[in-house]
Amino acid sequence: MQQPLTPVEAAAIILKACQELGAQIYFDEDVFVQTLRGSNTHPVRFFNLKTLRCFGALSELKAKQLLDGILWLIEDGYIDRVEEDRPLLLVAPNAFERIKTADLAEFASILGMWKKNE
């Protein structure tokens, strides 16, 4: 049986997905995410990380673990928190420029593990 992803691994997958979508992500206590493109007033889709097929690797993680991983990325400057009262997270424009080559290799292995769970 495969081990659940660590909070940092989960956050890395989310960050990678956000880069591909060019998206902002909202986290609430139920781990629902709203992705937005272009404008805060035009939502693209809602999905739940626990049930969405392509995020199956995250199914055993609790909301707190995901948020811990996201907060780790905020603290390291990979994601900007742009609202305090509601945890709206915006991928920083320079986030991927700041990730080291070793981190990118780790991303690739994490994403490989994620795809095996599809």
Regions found by a protein language model. Give the residues of each.
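Accessory DNA-binding and partner-docking regions appended to nucleic-acid-acting proteins
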Residues: 1-118
